[in-house]
Amino acid sequence: MDAGKAERRAGNGRRTDGRRHLVVAAACAAFIAAMVGVTYASVPLYAMFCALTGFGGATRVGAAPTSAPIEREITIRFDANVAPGLPWAFAPVERDVTVKVGATSLAHYTAANRSSMETHANATYNVSPPQAGAYFVKLQCFCFDEQTLAPNEKLEMPVVFYVDPAIAQDPDLKTLTDITLSYTFFPAKTPDKAAARASGTGG
């Protein structure tokens, strides 16, 4: 009888430990999901998240290249997206360009406000494949600042960039021939004073 009771107690203990582990795992998963959700809800936090983790192929912001271009060429493809709630048309002028690695290059996007109101937006960005983000360096980009378009205004926005020659030393990217640079514009919060002026209630 004593042996049977001991076995039952041991079995109950194992079940309790198993439930405890499941609860801890579920709590961790919920915390991670909540953090990712909060991050995506805020464009500035999203950019910080990408910069810290490399998630989605976050690119580098840097100075002009210090070494000469190399002979290797890579085709850069451009992608454009607009989040729901932003009445903009947004597209790349050039669908793709082939550049020498290490050479400073220029591309353009256009954005048009299709509404009758002034609108403000911020752009997030990423590179595919994600590993290439560490070597894609932007010198000038509309994504660095909030963009404002007047009613029905259309704007051409440049991107100045280069691919760091150090990519040639990365064994995982030695056969890479294409990189996709993707942007998504999200609505930005209008400052209170600007909103008040637009509604006619401001001083």
Swiss-Prot record:
GO terms for cellular component: plasma membrane. Its main location: membrane. GO terms for molecular function: copper ion binding. It is found in: Cell inner membrane. Residues 43-203 are periplasmic. One of its GO terms (biological process) is respiratory chain complex IV assembly. The keyword Ion transport does not apply. Residues 1-19 are cytoplasmic. It is a single-pass type II membrane protein. Belongs to the COX11/CtaG family. HAMAP family: CtaG. This is Cytochrome c oxidase assembly protein CtaG. It comes from Xanthobacter autotrophicus (strain ATCC BAA-1158 / Py2). The lineage of its organism: Bacteria, Pseudomonadati, Pseudomonadota, Alphaproteobacteria, Hyphomicrobiales. The gene is ctaG.
